Amino acid sequence: MDDKQKTNEEVKASSFDSEKSSKNQAFENTEEPAEGFQNVQHDNGSNPAQKQNSEAKEASKDQTNTNNNELSKKLEQLETERLTLQEKIAVLEQQHRELEEFLLKMKHEFALAKEALKRDQEKKERLLAESMARDLFPILDTLDHALEHDGENNGLRLIRSQLVSVLEKYGVVEVGKEGEVFDPNWHEFLGYAEGPENKIIKVVRKGYKIGDTLLRPALVVIGKESSC
C-alpha cells in the first residue's frame, strides 16, 4: 500500500470514528432529557398530592381554630347572659322581699286601723248611749215615782218598759235591786233600816251602767239587824 492510500484510509477511519462519536454523544444527549423528564414527572406527580394533603390539613386546622374561637365566644356570651340573669334574679328577689315586707306592714297597719276604728266606733256608740240614757233618766225617775202612787197604771208600766228596752238595746242596764248585797261600786248608801245585815232594803232611785262603766249609782237603804 502506498502512502496516499494509507492516508485516505486513515482519513476515512478518523471520519468514521468522529461520526460514531457524534452519534454516541447525540444518543447520550437524548437520554439525559428523558431522565430529566422523568424527574419532572416524578416531581409533578408526587408534590401536588402532598401539597393538597398539607393544604387540607392546614384548612382543617384553621377550621378547628375557627370553631374553637366561635365556641369560646359563645361560652363567653352565655356566661355574660348567665351573670346578667343572676343579677336580675337577685334584684327581683330583693324586690319580692321588699314587697312582702311592705304587704306585711300594710296588713299590720290595716289590722291596727281596723281595731282603732272598731274601738272608736264602740266609743262613739257608748257615748251616744250614755248621752241618750242620761236624757232618759229623769223620765224614768218620774215614771217610777208615778208608779209608786199608782201601781195599777198599766199605761205607765208599758211606757217605762219600752224605755228600758231601748236602753238595754244600747247596753244600758239597771243596777240596784232589793235583796242584793250592798256594793259601794254600784250603790250609794242613804241610810239604814231594820232588816238583813248589809242587804238592800229599799231602792230610792235606780242606778244604771254600760258594761263596767257606771252611769249612775243606785240610791239605796240597807238593812241592819236590831241590837235588841
Swiss-Prot record:
Gene that this sequence comes from: grpE
UniProt lineage: Bacteria, Pseudomonadati, Coprothermobacterota, Coprothermobacteria, Coprothermobacterales
Entry-linked CDD domains: GrpE
Chief subcellular location: cytoplasm
Origin: domain of life: Bacteria
Family: Belongs to the GrpE family.
Its biological purpose: Participates actively in the response to hyperosmotic and heat shock by preventing the aggregation of stress-denatured proteins, in association with DnaK and GrpE. It is the nucleotide exchange factor for DnaK and may function as a thermosensor. Unfolded proteins bind initially to DnaJ; upon interaction with the DnaJ-bound protein, DnaK hydrolyzes its bound ATP, resulting in the formation of a stable complex. GrpE releases ADP from DnaK; ATP binding to DnaK triggers the release of the substrate protein, thus completing the reaction cycle.
Source organism per UniProt: Coprothermobacter proteolyticus (strain ATCC 35245 / DSM 5265 / OCM 4 / BT)
Keyword Cytoplasm in annotation: yes
Bias (Basic and acidic residues): 1-22
SUPFAM superfamilies the record matches: Coiled-coil domain of nucleotide exchange factor GrpE, Head domain of nucleotide exchange factor GrpE
Biased composition range(s): Polar residues: 38-53
Region (Disordered) location: 1-71
Family annotation (InterPro entries): GrpE, GrpE_coiled_coil, GrpE_head
Complex and partners: Homodimer.
Compartments (UniProt record): Cytoplasm
Protein name: Protein GrpE
